[in-house]
Amino acid sequence: MDLPGPIHDFLLVFLGSGLLFGSLGVVLFPNPIFSAFSLGFVLVCISLLYILSNSHFVAAAQLLIYVGAITVLIIFAVMFMNDSEYSTDLNRWTVGDGITSVICTTILFSLISTILDTSWYGVIWTTRLNQILEQDLISNSQQIGIHLSTDFFLPFELISIILLVALIGAISVARQ
């Protein structure tokens, strides 16, 4: 979208805060249904960020695949769980929780220090030059197809395998 600067900045801050609070809701809500709905909200915010960056095809794919299918699949799987499976040990803090917290905190601070130490001026100009050259040659849909079949072939296949395993797991839970 070609919006004026202040409106674009406001929408970025609004969607960023929506992402932040939604992701906190995914982690902190005790009820898995609320966590799944919060995940859906986060994925919608990501799709709106794609729309702000003029990637309408990626935004539509984000809405259809992740919000429309994955979130519904997660809610479907959570609906089959018994209440006692997720509410009995909420207040216990294990060693694994502590190790995970330390690892996640370390990753967070390393990302923050990397972001603060990066010279964004050079990155922005390099990105703009590459976008101009690629946009002159082919469209966005063709770029996505080329990148999925060349640069991102392995992650694309891994995601399809993960989705297949999730679907098989949902079917096995539904049969029990």
Swiss-Prot record:
Transmembrane portions of the chain: 10-30, 32-52, 61-81, 95-115, 152-172
Protein name, per record: NAD(P)H-quinone oxidoreductase subunit 6, chloroplastic
Localization terms from the record: Plastid, Chloroplast thylakoid membrane
Signal peptide: none
Keywords for this protein: Chloroplast, Membrane, NAD, NADP, Plastid, Plastoquinone, Quinone, Thylakoid, Translocase, Transmembrane, Transmembrane helix, Transport
Family classification: Belongs to the complex I subunit 6 family.
Gene, per the UniProt record: ndhG
Main location as per UniProt: plastid
Cellular component terms (Gene Ontology): chloroplast thylakoid membrane
Subunit structure of this chain's protein: NDH is composed of at least 16 different subunits, 5 of which are encoded in the nucleus.
Protein task: NDH shuttles electrons from NAD(P)H:plastoquinone, via FMN and iron-sulfur (Fe-S) centers, to quinones in the photosynthetic chain and possibly in a chloroplast respiratory chain. The immediate electron acceptor for the enzyme in this species is believed to be plastoquinone. Couples the redox reaction to proton translocation, and thus conserves the redox energy in a proton gradient.
InterPro entries, sorted: NAD(P)H-Q_Oxidoreduct_6 (IPR050290), NADH_UbQ/plastoQ_OxRdtase_su6 (IPR001457), Nuo/plastoQ_OxRdtase_6_NuoJ (IPR042106)
Enzyme Commission number(s): 7.1.1.-
Catalysed transformations (reactions): a plastoquinone + NADH + (n+1) H(+)(in) = a plastoquinol + NAD(+) + n H(+)(out); a plastoquinone + NADPH + (n+1) H(+)(in) = a plastoquinol + NADP(+) + n H(+)(out)
Membrane topology: Multi-pass membrane protein
An example Gene Ontology molecular-function term: quinone binding
Annotated disulfide bonds: none
